[in-house]
Every structure is written in structure tokens, then in C-alpha cells.
A protein has these predicted regions:
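Acceptor-binding helix/loop patch of EC 2.4 sugar-transfer enzymes
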Residues: 10-37, 77-112, 274
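Short N-terminal targeting/anchoring amphipathic segment
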Residues: 48-66, 78-80
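Donor nucleotide-sugar binding/catalytic pocket of nucleotide-sugar-dependent glycosyltransferases
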Residues: 104-107, 115-154
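Conserved catalytic-core segment of nucleotide-activated headgroup transferases in glycan assembly
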Residues: 111, 145-230, 282
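Acidic donor-binding loop of glycosyltransferase active sites
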Residues: 122, 230-244, 255-257
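A charged, aromatic-enriched C-terminal amphipathic alpha-helix characteristic of glycosyltransferases
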Residues: 155, 303-338
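Short hydrophobic beta-strand element within catalytic cores of glycosyltransferases
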Residues: 248-252, 258-265
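Conserved acidic donor-binding segment of nucleotide-sugar-dependent glycosyltransferases
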Residues: 277-286, 293-303
Length: 343
């Protein structure tokens, strides 16, 4: 994140000698109460001396558990919090995969702690439409705003013949690529798809036999992912898993390239993807394979929407610029935050 100044804070070693460390951090942590533990960690953080004499006009936190540190910085400055999904869901999932000493913190307990802290804010900013809708219901008394995050744009050309999937190795991406290789790729034999990103290692670990069958499609980690988008004639978004906004989907939108995608790729966005002229929406593997095979036989470069000039003015590019560009983010944040600092 760009910043004019950066300061770092952490808990001093002396905190371990305090009884409050054991009661507010250690005890909740061993029972899986990450919500209370992480909030206590920021409460005990030692703030830099250089900030002591500064006047704080506004505090923008990117997680609810930063609120104690924010209030140590200023007890009165307007406080804006980005919710970053329902953290209680993430904590509950984390507890599924680790050893937790009973009694384990329940989802309801984790959520109540999260909401307790969020009620301290003056404004809640939600980064996707699903999240915004959720918190409108959970905290209807709060001021809730939908502001999509700024996502770095991908190049819009010159385009080419390549059909690509871009995917990192997180679990939802791995499952989505697995679905594509099991159910779509065998039905589209003319499509020579290139899969860029470190999803190759994740799939190899999860499904070695499937990876071996299709390993010729994988490029692995690519230093210049922009070049992948720039030279693509068609981008695939075979998304079947995940929640919250898909950053890879936003990157693909910004490239302006023709897309074949599942509805799940557009999760968290207030848009009907069927209204985007350069998007072919497919709700099942058969439809995805049919669209992909037809595009491969025709040749991606023959699509009039695949050239650099067409990509610059495509529907997905316009949607990106209006919602996910740095200018769009700055404008929306300014409009909702300005009343807090001028009241």
C-alpha cells in the first residue's frame, strides 16, 4: 500500500510478565478465541514515540482487531474500519485445522466479539457486495458503505492467440483448476490452455495423477503476469469455489480481454455479467467446454473483441475503471469519509 510514512509497532517483551497477557491473549488463544486474542495483541502494542505528538484527524483500520491500537493512538479521531470479510468465519475455519483446548470458542462467540469491536467505529467499509449485504443485516444501526478495493490493472494488449488461466495456489483456486481439468478440458480437445501461477504445485500436492496428465499446460510461477494478460486472446475464469471478491477476476476484467467464466467468478460484485459483451457466462462444465472448444477452433485472435484497441473500450474494462481503479477507490473513499473530518 502506498504511504508517505510508515511506522511499526509490536508488543514489548515485558508484556509476558503481566497477568493480563495470560488472561487476555494466552487463555483465549489456546481455546481458539482468535478474535479476543488478536484484539488484545494490538491493545498491548507499543506505539512509536514519533507518533506521540501528532494530531490525528482520521484513522482508517483494515481489520476490527486493530481498533484497540487505533484508540490508543487517538481516543477521539473518527474511525473507519474495513471489515475484510466476516473474520469469525475465518477463525472458525482455522480452528477446524488446529488443536484447540476445550472448550473451543464457538462461531457465535467469535462473531459477537467481532461485532462488539465494529460497533466502536464511525463508518464500516465493505470490500464486496456480499460482505456489505451481510453487515447491513448484522449491524443495521451502523453506517455501512460498499467500496470496492483498488486493484492493479492488467495490460490491455496487444492480444494474441493464447488461451490462459491465471491462478495462485490457494485452496479455492486449486479446486477450481481441478474442476476445469477434470470436467472441462477433456471436452475441449482443441483448446491449448496455458495455466500461469503457482497453482501447479498446489494441484500436484492435492491430485498428483491429475497434475501428471495435464502438466504440459502449466507455466508455473510467472514473474511478469502482466505479459500473460497482454498477449492473451482469451482469458478463462473457471471459478467454482471461494468467497469474497476474486482479485484474479478483477485483474481479468481490467485486461479487457474476452472472457469465458462461471457465475462464481463474479461473486461479491454488483453486476450481472451477462450484460458484459465480452463475457461468455457458463453455468456448468458442458457449457464451459462448448464455448471454449468453439473459441479454440475459430482461433482467439479472430475475435474482434480480442485486439488491444477493442480491449481498451470493452465492457469489462469500463466496469473495472468505474469500480476497481485507484481513481474510483479514492473518489468513493473521499465522498464517504469527508463528512467525518469536516463535521
Amino acid at each position: 500500500m502506498p504511504a508517505d510514512e510508515r511506522y511499526y509497532a509490536n508488543m514489548p517483551a515485558s508484556v509476558f510478565a503481566r497477568p493480563s497477557f495470560w488472561s487476555e491473549i494466552y487463555w483465549p488463544l489456546i481455546h481458539g478465541d482468535h478474535a479476543r486474542a488478536t484484539a488484545a495483541m494490538t491493545k498491548f502494542a507499543r506505539l512509536p514515540d514519533a507518533l506521540a505528538g501528532r494530531t490525528i484527524d482520521l484513522i482508517h483500520c483494515n481489520h476490527f482487531f486493530c481498533i484497540p491500537a487505533a484508540r490508543n493512538l487517538s481516543a477521539t479521531a473518527p474511525l473507519v474500519i474495513e471489515t475484510q470479510d466476516v473474520q469469525a468465519l475465518q477463525y472458525d475455519l482455522r480452528n477446524e485445522g488446529i488443536f484447540v483446548i476445550p472448550p473451543r470458542a464457538t462461531y457465535d462467540e467469535l462473531l459477537e466479539t467481532e461485532l462488539e469491536f465494529l460497533r466502536m467505529a464511525d463508518l464500516l467499509v465493505h470490500l464486496n457486495a456480499e460482505e456489505w449485504d451481510t453487515f447491513e443485516k448484522l449491524l443495521p444501526e451502523m453506517r455501512n458503505a460498499l467500496v470496492y478495493p483498488a486493484v492493479e490493472e492488467a495490460p490491455t494488449g496487444p492480444g494474441g492467440e493464447t488461451i490462459v488461466i491465471v491462478a495462485s495456489g490457494n485452496f479455492p483456486n486449486t479446486l477450481s483448476v481441478e474442476w476445469f481439468l477434470e470436467h472441462v478440458a477433456p471436452q475441449a480437445p482443441h483448446a491449448q490452455v496455458k495455466i500461469a501461477g503457482n497453482v501447479d504445485g498446489a494441484l500436484k500436492a492435492r491430485n498428483p495423477a491429475l497434475y501428471e496428465r495435464w502438466k504440459h499446460l502449466f507455466l508455473g510461477r510467472v514473474d511478469d503476469i502482466g505479459a500473460i494478460y497482454a498477449n492473451a486472446g482469451l482469458v478463462l475464469l473457471p471459478t467454482t469455489e471461494g468467497h469474497g471478491l476474486s482479485i484474479k477476476a478483477v485483474e481479468a476484467l481490467s485486461s479487457g480481454a474476452p472472457l469465458i467464466a462461471t457465475p462464481q467468478a463474479f461473486r461479491g460484485m454488483k453486476i450481472d455479467p451477462r450484460a458484459l459483451a465480452n463475457v461468455t457466462l457458463c453455468e456448468n462444465a458442458e457449457g464451459f467446454a462448448t464455448a471454449l472448444e468453439a473459441a479454440a477452433i475459430a482461433g482467439p485472435a479472430t475475435n474482434t473483441m480480442a485486439s488491444g484497441a477493442a480491449r481498451e473500450t470493452s465492457d469489462t474494462r469500463k466496469f473495472y475503471l468505474a469500480n476497481f481503479s485507484h481513481d474510483a477507490y479514492a473518489e468513493k473513499i473521499r465522498d464517504i469519509v469527508l463528512p467525518l473530518v469536516t463535521r
